[in-house]
């Protein structure tokens, strides 16, 4: 059914839109404080430094990191943090059924789960701004859930499929997070 295919594509597009709306908040958290640096890799020592900063500055008790898969892959390649099959899971307090597709599979470092998201924008220098934050730093508020409707347009001799949603993303507590900049260049596949 063509409407099922279109509905799936529209749903995926709306999810990406909401995702990137949240990403746009990262650079302004904590008064624009950013950790990490452009052209620097997501090494275990850099991640540990960011975690220490977050804990020392009282970001909260449910801290997480979200970054681009290319950055997280460098960490995975560089460090012995890869979880063996099923022995390590998300830190407690996370909804595994909702976040399993974004969890990096890395052991939590100092109790901090690391997630990856390919929707993070990579700039012309191959850097991306992710986030280290507490769960209470940002929020999404929905007044109208996502709806899909069909609308017949006789002049086009077609049926349009329209998707709508009314929501907002905002900083709930600015002091509980910071942008996290690391290199996000793709790892070589031909070594």
What are these regions (language model features)?
Residues 20, 24, 33, 73, ...:
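Flexible, active-site-adjacent loop/turn segments at secondary-structure boundaries
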Residues 1-31, 57-59, 65-66, 150-169:
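Long, contiguous amphipathic alpha-helices that act as assembly "spine/axial" helices in icosahedral shell
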Residues 78-191:
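Sequence/fold signature of self-assembling virion shell proteins
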């Amino acid at each position: 059914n063509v409407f099922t295919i279109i509905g799936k594509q529209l749903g995926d597009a709306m999810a990406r839109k909401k995702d990137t709306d949240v990403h746009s908040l990262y650079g302004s958290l904590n008064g624009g404080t950013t950790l990490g640096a452009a052209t620097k890799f997501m090494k275990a020592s850099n991640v540990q430094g960011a975690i220490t900063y977050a804990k020392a500055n009282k970001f909260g008790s449910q801290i997480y990191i979200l970054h681009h898969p290319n950055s997280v892959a460098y960490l995975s390649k560089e460090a012995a943090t890869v979880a063996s099959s099923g022995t390590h899971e998300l830190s407690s307090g996370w909804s595994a059924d909702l976040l399993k597709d974004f969890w990096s599979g890395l052991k939590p470092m100092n109790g901090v789960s690391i997630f990856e998201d390919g929707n993070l924008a990579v700039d012309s220098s191959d850097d991306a701004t992710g986030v280290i934050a507490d769960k209470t730093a940002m929020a999404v508020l929905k007044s109208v859930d996502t709806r899909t409707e069909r609308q017949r347009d006789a002049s086009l001799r077609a049926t349009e499929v329209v998707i709508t949603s009314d929501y907002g993303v905002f900083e709930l507590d600015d002091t509980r997070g910071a942008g996290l900049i690391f290199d996000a260049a793709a790892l070589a596949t031909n070594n």
